[in-house]
Design a protein with these regions (language model features):
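Extended acidic low-complexity intrinsically disordered regions
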Residues: 1-15
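Extended hydrophobic/Leu-rich segments
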Residues: 6-10, 21, 117
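Generic marker of residues within folded, mature protein domains
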Residues: 9, 24-26, 72
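Short acidic-hydrophobic surface loop/beta-edge motif
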Residues: 15-29
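Short, surface-exposed, charged amphipathic helix/loop patches that serve as local interaction elements
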Residues: 28-125
Length: 125
């Protein structure tokens, strides 16, 4: 591997990769598709910085952040890794926006799948 390979690998992660959520019980495809950036992308880097800023703003005078606030900040960070989607509700496409994305990510098994995919560099080769 050369320095060019390293730099190109990180830059390529910015495009994101398609991930289709799997049914949490039987693993079958759900038809819900998300495009997620890789952990070395600039978008992921900015998401981590925004997480730090958000936690700093939420801290009380003693530097403590409630568990509820930490969880909200973590979900916001995870949402910043998703750059587009193909999601339907009934027969209608669901608009891609932060509110709708956080609504989806509030489901525990969805969070787990998105987080695992986003963190695994093998998905971005």
């Amino acid at each position: 591997m050369t320095l060019d390979d390293v730099m190109n690998f990180a830059a390529d992660q910015e495009r994101g990769r398609e991930y289709e959520l799997a049914d949490p019980v039987d693993g079958t495809p759900t038809g819900i598709k998300l495009w997620i950036v890789g952990p070395d992308s600039e978008t992921a880097h900015k998401a981590r910085l925004a997480l730090s800023d958000e936690l700093s703003e939420l801290a009380d005078a003693d530097g403590r952040v409630s568990a509820e606030s930490r969880e909200k900040a973590r979900l916001n960070c995870l949402a910043r890794h998703v750059i587009r989607w193909d999601v339907k509700e009934g027969d209608e496409a669901v608009p891609f926006n932060t509110k709708n994305l956080l609504r989806l990510l509030n489901v525990q098994w969805v969070q787990a799948q998105v987080d695992a995919f986003a963190a695994d560099r093998r998905n971005f080769r």
